[in-house]
């Protein structure tokens, strides 16, 4: 890659941390609002047996919208917003790990791969209990029980804000499984998200390098970065979706064994069962990845320490 194609990377020591975290929370919230409906749809598709209720992403979207309205697409959203904490822990761990690995390797791919995997380990330790509660709320549907637990009372008009539902689910999890219930599927989550995060970065650099060779010299870096991100996300989603299906079933259905869940899924639905919810996952990942690739670098530019803003070309 030619020198003028090289992108100056803003590292941890270049940032005004206060601005970085304030802008970061706002950016993350915007992403969550835009992709949450597809996260909910993906969860329901992965848990349902065969095509007993929904026949695909679009069918699920239409049926949920008809049955529960827009609020139904955001069921469990309030609880899910607590993962903003894990999101900030992710970026902090990612940046600090990059800084640490830089003492041993100057390869951007190596730094990103190790940092991505480490960041996912930290983030998932915080996210899994929130995910468990959020997923059970996602599975609530008027008049039907789709998961292990069902909230009591009328779901009519209750979507985004439903404190009573959340407390009800938490109590049922505690009663059935104790505190361990909030970490059900933890290993499966690690086996899903650590590889996903670690794999994304090498593919991102690969696609960016290939596109930089194809694009005209005057093409801005941001263009092939914005294209490379979703391509890398789609690739990582395809590779890790089987584990994501198993993770979701372990957490929602209360299964205790990854191996037994895998065997049951294969027996009931065959290999295609491992690809359930893939299109919804890619759809939800695409906008967030574009924002992460384009927005995250813009976020870091906005968060530069004042004395560094004009000191070099970022």
Curated annotation (Swiss-Prot):
UniProt keyword annotations, A-Z? Amino-acid transport, Membrane, Mitochondrion, Repeat, Transmembrane, Transmembrane helix, Transport
Name a GO molecular-function annotation: branched-chain amino acid transmembrane transporter activity
Found, by tissue, as follows: Highly expressed in brown adipose tissues compared with other metabolic organs.
Topology with regard to the membrane? Multi-pass membrane protein
Q: Where are the transmembrane segments?
A: 20-42, 71-90, 113-133, 185-201, 222-239, 278-296
Annotated catalysed reactions: L-valine(in) = L-valine(out); L-leucine(in) = L-leucine(out)
> Where does the protein end up?
Mitochondrion membrane
PROSITE patterns assigned: SOLCAR (PS50920)
Q: Where are the Solcar repeats?
A: 18-100, 107-210, 220-302
Q: What protein name is recorded for this chain?
A: Solute carrier family 25 member 44
The record lists the organism as: Mus musculus
